[in-house]
C-alpha cells in the first residue's frame, strides 16, 4: 500500500488527490481570513457528517443546498488541487475542510481569528473504518490484511500519518476561543446537543423547528440517500464494490475485528502516546 503514498515532511499523503506542491502552497501561501470556518479531522472520523451539519446550520435546516450541491463543493478540500483553486479565488467567508496535521497547515491561520471545528473519533474505530473504506476502492493497490494495516496504523504509516501526532498537534490549540473540539461518540449519543454546541460556537441562533430539521437531514439514513453527500457521484472507474463512504456510522465496531492481543497492543500504544492529557478527556476511555 505504501506505493500509493507521497511522503512530504514526514507525512504519507494519498497520491490520488493530494499533491505535494499544493500542500506546500497551503502551508506557505494560502491566506486564512478571519471570517473563514475550517472543518479539521483525521480521516474516517465523521468528516462528512460534520460538513452536513454545518451546512444545514447555515441554511437553518433548509435542505435545498445540501441536496443540490456536492459536499466537496460546499466545503472544498484545502489540500486538493481543485479545492485549493476554488478557495483561493473565492471572496467573502469560506467554509473549507482539511485532514492536514498542524505542522503542514497554513501558517497564516495561527495569526487569524478564523474558526476551527476539530472532530475526534476513537482511533480504534478510525482504524477499522479506514481499512474497510480502502478495501472497497480501486484507489489502493494491493491492500494488505487488517492485521498488517493495524501495525501500519500504530506506526503512523497510513494516509495523513499518525493519528496520535495529529491529535497531539491540533489539541495544543484547544484553549483558544476560536477552536471547538468535538467527539464523534458525543455526536452519536446526543446529536442535537452537538448541533446546539456548534450553533453557539458559530453565533447562530436556530429555533426548535430549525434544529429538528438540521437533525433530520443530517441523520445517517438521510445522508446515505443523498447523492450530494454519499459520494455516489464519484467516477465508477475509481471504485470496485461501491465507495462505501458510509459503511455503518456506529461506535465500537472495532470490537468485532480486533483480537485480544491487538486490543492489548493498541491500549498500550494509546497510553504511551497520549500521556499528558487529563484522565477522562476522551469519551471512549
UniProtKB/Swiss-Prot annotation:
> Has keyword Ribonucleoprotein?
no
Q: What is this protein called?
A: Sulfotransferase 2A6
Its EC number is 2.8.2.2, 2.8.2.14
Q: Where is the active site?
A: 99
Regarding protein family, the annotation reads: Belongs to the sulfotransferase 1 family.
Q: Does the keyword Protease apply?
A: no
**What taxonomic classification does the UniProt entry list for its organism?**
Eukaryota, Metazoa, Chordata, Craniata, Vertebrata
Q: SUPFAM superfamilies annotated for this entry?
A: P-loop containing nucleoside triphosphate hydrolases
Q: Which organism is it from?
A: Mus musculus
Q: What's a GO cellular component annotated to this UniProt protein?
A: cytosol
